[in-house]
């Protein structure tokens, strides 16, 4: 299946493809286009839009697109993914929903990746996914230790 979103990816538009590829659609293909072209291209390519306004897999209230995907594809049964969703939310939004302490750190790392000069959004995603692999491992460890809000919960 094809999945489409806005170009010049930031936190949620890197986290969502990682989540989709690992837990929803192992054969996923990702398309990144100008914001004003997403819906037209989604229709033309028969692609699923995500992290754009007014779509099912977008922001709703203070929840980010990663969380919409968790809910839609019933991934909320995995408490480590739920914790990762809170961290992504904290990095992608004003962090007022969960006040997840790890969120600002992820935001800083993601911003750093944007300044490393990757040739396009595909290359940036490929490079940055290791961060999400590591964060997921961290979240699994926090769950095993009973720290469902992460190590640095307030």
Residue ranges of model-derived segments:
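Conserved, aromatic- and glycine-enriched, well-ordered alpha/beta core segments
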Residues: 2-6, 13-77
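Histidine (H) residue identity feature
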Residues: 8, 59-60, 115, 122
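Active-site-proximal structural scaffolding
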Residues: 12-13, 125
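A charged, amphipathic interaction segment
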Residues: 71-154
């Amino acid at each position: 299946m094809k999945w489409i979103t806005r170009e010049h990816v930031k936190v949620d538009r890197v986290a969502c493809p990682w989540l989709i590829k690992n837990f929803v659609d192992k054969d996923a293909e990702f398309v990144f286009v100008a914001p004003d072209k997403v819906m037209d291209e989604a229709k033309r390519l028969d692609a699923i839009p995500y992290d754009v306004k007014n779509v099912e897999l977008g922001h709703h209230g203070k929840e980010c697109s990663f969380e919409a995907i968790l809910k839609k594809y019933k991934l909320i049964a995995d408490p480590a993914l739920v914790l990762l969703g809170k961290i992504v939310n904290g990095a992608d939004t004003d962090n007022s929903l969960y006040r997840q302490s790890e969120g600002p750190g992820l935001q800083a790392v993601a911003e750093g990746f944007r300044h490393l000069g990757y040739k396009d959004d595909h290359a940036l995603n490929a490079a940055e996914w290791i961060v999400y692999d590591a964060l997921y491992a961290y979240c699994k460890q926090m769950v095993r230790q009973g720290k469902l809000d992460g190590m640095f919960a307030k």
